[in-house]
Amino acid sequence: MSIPKTFSQVSRRSISLVRPTATTLVPTEAELKTATQTNAEELFDDDDAKKPISTTKFQVLGQPATMASLIVPPSIPLYVRRGCLVSLHGAEKLSMNYEWVHFWSNLIHYRSIKPSIYHKLVSTSKFNALVAPNFLSNRIGPWLGLSSSPFRTLCLLNLNGSADWNVWGQDSVVAYENNSSLSVQPPNPFLIRLRSQAFSSKYQTVQGRGNVLLSGSGSVYTVDLKDAKDEIIIRSEHLLAVSGANRREITNAITEQKLSPPPEMTRKVPSEAGRFFESIRELDGRLFWDSSKAVGIKFWNWTRRIYSRLINGPTKYLKIQGPRTLLIQSSYNVYLPASPINRNSVEQQWAKPDSLAQNPSKNYFNYASVSTNGNVEFEATPNFNETVKKIEESGNKKR
């Protein structure tokens, strides 16, 4: 199929990335005053609004880039994830409806229908749209102590047909134009099971010509691998997208890097479970309580890790070989356990005030001695060997 001449204006691939800074996270009073005087018409260029266009124009806004401006020509469908559409401007006759995109594939990969629900926008005239990465959060995760990335930023992917992209994550593709030369397709879930892959199959392949708006966890950066000798090792959760000649070539360029622990870390140490059963045998109340608390904490942390593994898959270190371009995100692309609970944190929460704190005693048993004159004396001892010896000696004297 021949490519229209209108696409000849796009001569190279460009990726717009924005690094968030601390100064822009909290706006000043002057910035807030300026923002209150801005309306939707002033957000876009008036000259561009009057000019007819034949191709879409995507532009990220702000620092960090938490919003994007999309200018769409007439009769070009625009797909936007549900919940990410902020506003529309200049659309006289607009058709908007829900569209299920790759329903069965997303249901198998992510066990959710949310990644499949898109707004499909088509207008008879040019219109402007504002889009933000407003995804619904996981409701079960926070209850289990799981946390998602603190914020998501946008980056623009403009394709000219020279390379394909594999994009990972169920919330990575925010919006894209549905022209005849742009394709956004997930892999076939049944064919993937027939061959092993080094990394997750939860990705979408973007190929052709057009604009795609991506969302990454935290800030998004590019890494350019110049040639076949250039390679990088990256933690799998931070990988957002990889370019290549085609889907198979990208898959073959990614291999798993095995990281073996140091020899001293492989030595076996007594576990908390061992101390737990040891305390039961010795009938040691203090040791039994400490061991039970430690076992409970370890079990809770283990439950959260298992839940995270079921959702996200195992953590891997990936070796990626060039030449290609990578998109790296600073935060995780998945739900991960928050900081694991440890014994020290629990003890600090329940620690007594300094005025009431006492030095820990090495003895575990207290007993009282009543003399013939009625005096009572309390003593502490690790065992009753010495007391039993005194009783035996006093009994021998009476004999």
Curated annotation (Swiss-Prot):
Domain of life assignment: Eukaryota
Keyword annotations of the record: Mitochondrion, Transit peptide
**Which parts pass through the membrane?**
none
- Give the record's GO CC terms: mitochondrial inner membrane
Where does it reside?
Answer: Mitochondrion
Give the UniProt record's GO annotations in the biological process aspect.
inner mitochondrial membrane organization
Pfam families according to UniProt: AIM24
From which residue to which does the transit peptide run? 1-22
**Chief location bin:** mitochondrion
Q: Which InterPro entries match?
A: AIM24, AIM24_sf, Trp_RNA-bd_attenuator-like_dom
Instruction: Tell me the protein family, please.
Output: Belongs to the AIM24 family.
- What name appears for this protein in its UniProt entry? Altered inheritance of mitochondria protein 24, mitochondrial
Organism equals Zygosaccharomyces rouxii (strain ATCC 2623 / CBS 732 / NBRC 1130 / NCYC 568 / NRRL Y-229)
